[in-house]
Amino acid sequence: NGCYKDSGDRLIEELENLLNQNIQIKKVTLIGHSYGGILVTHLLNNWKNTVTLDAHIIASPLQGNTSLNTLCGYKPEVNLKPMANLFEWRTQQDLDSAFKDLPKNPQNIAISGSFVTVLPDTYKGHRLGHNWSISWVADQLKKP
């Protein structure tokens, strides 16, 4: 139906199967960009495994919107479990083509325990907007 729950539940199931078959895995790292961040927050809210989960959410409208909230039952809340770490990478609203015309920044949400980074204006000579945000974060994550 285009909503995130079925895909999110499938992702949880597949990760659980992978972890059950590979007990040596001690940490899972997920990256969700834009609406992929909604999927990752669903996983965060429903994670029951004891394996550490690092979730990186990039330029994601975690406040939701009318259709997401109404049609899909999305609630803009994330409850981090002790074994989960959330890293929010937020674009500047006026530079993000997906968010710049909205009355308020849909990335702004208070999540207890989350680490928030607001991205700079530019990346390698480009306006650091919605799409370039993935590359910028990837560069940050590969730093030692």
Predicted regions and their residues:
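Active-site nucleophile loop of the alpha/beta-hydrolase fold
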Residues: N1, A55-T66, T91-D94
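Active-site signature of alpha/beta-hydrolase-fold catalytic machinery across serine-
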Residues: H42-N46
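Flexible "cap/lid" loop of the alpha/beta hydrolase fold
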Residues: P61-N79
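Gly/Ala-rich beta-loop-alpha elbow adjacent to hydrolase catalytic centers
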Residues: I31-T41
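Structural recognition of the beta-strand scaffold that forms the well-ordered cores
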Residues: T29-I31, D54-I58, L86-R90
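C-terminal catalytic-base region of ester-bond hydrolases, centering on the histidine
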Residues: Y74-P144
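Active-site catalytic motif of lipid deacylating hydrolases and related acyltransferases
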Residues: N1-K26
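A general structural motif
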Residues: Q24-K27, T50-T52, M83
